[in-house]
Every structure is written in C-alpha cells, then in structure tokens.
C-alpha cells in the first residue's frame, strides 16, 4: 500500500470521550491532530486516491464554541455556628442526598454529584457521622434535577444557643421530597428561577447549622 494514505483515525469530544481507533497504525506512521482551541469541528474536507478509494489527506472546518455558563453561589441560610464547608460547583447535577436526622433536627448531610464527564463524585460528610437516623433522597438523574430547597432553623437543646437546621425539604423539576427532620414551617427557600442546583455549601459541627447552594442555568441540550 502507498504510505501516503491515512491509516487510522481517533475522535475526541468536548465531554472527554475518546472513540476507538478506526483503521490501524504502522511503526512508521506519522501522527497528526486536527484541533483549534475553543472551537468545535463542524465539517471535514480532504483528498482521496483515485482508483483505490484511500483517503490521503484530511482537514476540518471549525466554529467557536460558546463559553460554558458560570455557576452562581447563593448565600447560605441558617444559624451562625459551626465551621464553614463548600463542596464546590464543578458538577452538572446532584444524584443523591443522604440526610442524617435526630430528635432535634438535621444531624448531618452528604451529597452525591455527577460531573460533566459522567464521573460520580461523593461529597464530604457534613455534621455528625454517628447518625441516629439515616434517610436518602434519590434523583432520577439526569432527567430529574434539583430546583429548590426549603428549610427551617432554631435553637434546640444541646446547641449552646446556636441555631441549627431542624427541617429540610427538596424540590426537583418532577416532585418534592418528604420533610426531613422536624415537621416545621419553612423559614427560608434556596432557589433561583431558571436555574438548577449543582452544589452545596454551608456550616456544620455535630449538627447542620447553615445551608447554601451553587446553581447553573437550566439548559435542554
């Protein structure tokens, strides 16, 4: 075979996926990369060898990709006690929420996230790991996503005059979770119209004191 033909191709996407190698390589193959930083490939052109049908050259057409939307951090709500924590905002959504509840409210909370290359990220455990009661709220991700959180906080026995979270309730684009903790009227709502929740931050000690959210615009791509 004429050495001046393309013997293999591999494709990469913006989501970090790499295709299998199509064709085969040889020990003396010359590698090339078609890429333009910040652009997507929207078409191809090239040359082929008449008679054999082999492709001898390949080029690409590029178009600038829109910048990904920036996340926004909404202020945490709750009491002033506890140490600050922040799971970050480098996620595409929330898959599961683990809520530890006790007789006086929310003892702990932990979140399971997914990022833009479909990796599952387990967030840190915030609050008392020695749970008295453990509940889970599963989302049907990616079709289901969080849109708001309702909660209430108050001073309870053992909180040393620091207000702690006593109730949380989560709403998605499809449904509303049960009320976790005490059955109390909400004193705050974490929500931004047209956005989904992709991360959490707050303050905790042996209880959850404060909770805030990171949000991204809802897209339907």
UniProtKB/Swiss-Prot annotation:
PROSITE patterns registered for this protein in UniProt: JACALIN_LECTIN
The alphabetized UniProt keywords are:
Lectin, Repeat
> Where on the tree of life does the source sit, at the highest rank?
Eukaryota
Q: Disulphide bridges in this chain? A: none
Q: Extract one GO molecular function annotation from the record.
A: carbohydrate binding
Matching entries from Pfam families are given as: Jacalin
Residue ranges annotated for the Jacalin-type lectin domain, each copy included = 1-64, 71-217
| Family assignment from sequence similarity | Belongs to the jacalin lectin family.
Q: What is this protein called?
A: Jacalin-related lectin 47
What organism does the record attribute this protein to?
A: Arabidopsis thaliana (Mouse-ear cress)
